[in-house]
């Protein structure tokens, strides 16, 4: 399976590493270029932007967003705008569940699937 990861802090980096060990292909992006270099050195692919991350992936895409809750909604929207019907965007942060219900309703007409899997 191929998975995109937006946000390569402690949790996103750890998830990419575990997924790579399990045999999955990962593409990662973080606004901190050093975080991207770190996962590339661990065997993942890196991207310099969210657009590049999506462009490296094969449909149907699954993009996991692991950013602080304050930024999750805007990043999920940015990712979803680049996806196609049938793709999946995952909010893995600790966003308020009500915000995620609203995001799911907002994205439903686009055909992009939204999954809330709070991990912290």
Regions found by a protein language model. Give the residues of each.
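Beta-loop-alpha module in the N-terminal Rossmann-like domain of NAD(P)-dependent dehydrogenases
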Residues: 63-79, 96-99
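NAD(P)+-binding Rossmann beta1-loop-alpha1 motif at the extreme N-terminus of oxidoreductases
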Residues: 1-61, 86, 115
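Fold-independent oxyanion-binding glycine-rich loops
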Residues: 31, 50, 67, 92-93, ...
């Amino acid at each position: 399976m191929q998975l995109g990861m937006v946000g390569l802090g402690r949790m996103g980096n750890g998830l990419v590493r575990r997924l790579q060990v399990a045999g999955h292909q990962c593409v990662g992006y973080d606004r901190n270029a050093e975080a991207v270099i770190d996962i590339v050195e661990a065997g993942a692919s890196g991207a310099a932007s969210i657009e590049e991350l999506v462009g490296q992936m094969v449909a149907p895409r699954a993009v996991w967003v692991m950013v602080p809750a304050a930024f999750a909604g805007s990043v999920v929207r940015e990712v979803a705008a680049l996806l196609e019907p049938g793709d999946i965007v995952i909010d893995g942060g600790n966003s308020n569940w009500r915000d995620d219900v609203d995001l799911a309703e907002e994205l439903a007409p686009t055909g992009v699937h939204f999954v809330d899997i709070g991990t912290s």
